Amino acid sequence: RDYYASRGLGDVYKRQGNDNLGSSLHGSYDAFGTHVMFNENSVKYIPYYLKSQDYPDVTWEKTVMKNIGLDFSLLNDRVNGSFDYFWNDITDMLGYANSNGLSMFGSYPINGAHIRRYGWDATLNTVNVTTKDFKWTSVLTLSHTNAIWKERMPNHTYNEYQIRKDEPVNARYYYRTNGLVNLDKSNMPSYQPEAYQKPGCPIIVDLNGDGLITVEDVDMKNVIPSLYWGFGNTFTYKNWDLDVFIYSQLGVDKYNDVYSWTSGRGLGNQTNNMSVYIKDVWHSELNPNGTIPGIAYEMASVSLPGGAGTDIGYENSSFVRVRNITLGYNFKPNQLGALSKLLSGIRVYVDVQNPFTFTGYTGLDPEVNTGGNYKGGKAEYPQTRTFSLGAKLSF
């Protein structure tokens, strides 16, 4: 019996350049909008000015793309798949630096940074069951990707708490919180920052346990999901077929912007409808067990060492979503009667998109992003659940 059918191993190396600053790297002159007349207005002089400088030492960005992959097939092709690992190095990245005083131009282009993007993709296709009337096949896909700074621009200014080596490009820095200061402050730790010592303020976590709140207590998360996966299944029984596809993103947080509509200080002058989250805002008399900071706390008006924010409003937005379920029936020619003269087959089906989502995220949708920032939302509209009924005619 042939348990091992085939395998293939390959690698790819590719290099390319990129000039994303356009014509700003090349010197040019342009005419002023006015001219000067000499010799009793008989001679016209058009003055020109230096519009942009030449920068002969500035080069294109360079991207080196490397990839290695493996394709395999087992059990007489009942199991086959692939695995690809890639890493791309982007060097001599283009940017701008401020010019010295009295310069004709406020900034000038430079090379300097280095980003590494890396990750892997895996696919597994299987034929699980095959009989005379029934067949079940599956496809599983897994993917992971990340991007880190190998080198920053020479003019980059680090915050005190920033990681200097291999910092994720999409890093988010924040102070962890652990509940709210109660009315008598009996649960407030001794190291609580002064600006956060009023009842209803979030309790800041001393991450390194030294009894102080400093930049050493700033935590970091990568806003790129740690894993994407999808799982599709197709079942066929005689003339019937059923397709179910599930996909997921894991290991990612997202800001639930509805929290910004629960500002305690904004309640007094709001005339529009408020979020139901307002019921969770801390209040010394009406809601002493509230979980959202009260009127004494306004994130924009108080700061922590280094200027990092907190995790207030951020939630784990990992999810598993049933993307679609499709059930169909195929009419063969011998079932069409008189229609068989015109048609070779008819398929009728019902389909539902986004019927189920499993997540701990309390906002409207853990995936949709309408706020302009990756994984940040502005009370986004959830993905639509749709139901369809259709037919496909084959002539």
Give residue spans per PLM region.
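Proline-rich low-complexity regions
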Residues: 74, 224-225, 293-303, 382
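Conserved small-residue
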Residues: 20-25, 110-113, 127-223, 254, ...
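Active/binding-pocket-proximal capping segment
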Residues: 86-91, 100-102, 248-252, 259-263
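Extracytoplasmic gating/loop element in the C-terminal half of outer-membrane beta-barrel translocons
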Residues: 249-347
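Short, hydrophobic/aromatic alpha-helical segments in well-folded domains
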Residues: 69, 214-216, 228-231
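Glycine-rich, aromatic-lined ligand/substrate-binding cores of catalytic
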Residues: 223-256
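Extracellular/periplasmic, surface-exposed regions of secreted and cell-surface proteins
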Residues: 1, 6-7, 11-174, 309-395
